[in-house]
Amino acid sequence: CAANTMLLDGRLKLFLQVCEAVSHAHANLIVHRDLKPSNILVTPNGDVRLLDFGIAKLLDDPEPAPVHPRTEVRAFTLHYAAPEQVRGELVTTMTDVYSLGVVLYELLADTKPYRLRRQTDAEWEEAILAVEPLKPSVATLRTTDGSRARCPETRRNARKLVGDLDNIALKALAKQPEQRY
């Protein structure tokens, strides 16, 4: 969306289609477990398709998910992983809600929810587990050189995020699964 400079309303319409697709998967007892922009395809006529269900899990699967120590290779994309995935805990539909929250945050603020210095996996894990992200309306104005904050269009977009959109994104990024929706 950023590459195509899609306006906020257009981004939100596409995101709602993503949410509908994820809701359909959840209604069929499927958790995607690796939702991220590269697994979301927008067709030329504007329809959204979810891709790569390779690590998806059936919720009624009697086989418990293996617990992975933090040092073991895991099958998910860390930047979009929920805290319970990082900890190697049980994955539920709320895991996908967290990943959707990261995608929404990026659509709203044009940045990831966590600002890291070194971008190491350990720093990402710590942020996912312990750092509370800024509101998207605040994050959209923060850059290292302040150039975006000086742009009238950026300030106008930030004002559109204050309130409901800020709250929805942060609710989806709650650290505890039972606090997300």
Task: Go through the PLM ranges and name each one.
Residues 4-8, 13-23, 27, 31, ...:
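C-terminal lobe helix-coil module of Hanks-type protein kinase domains
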Residues 63-75:
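Regulatory activation segment
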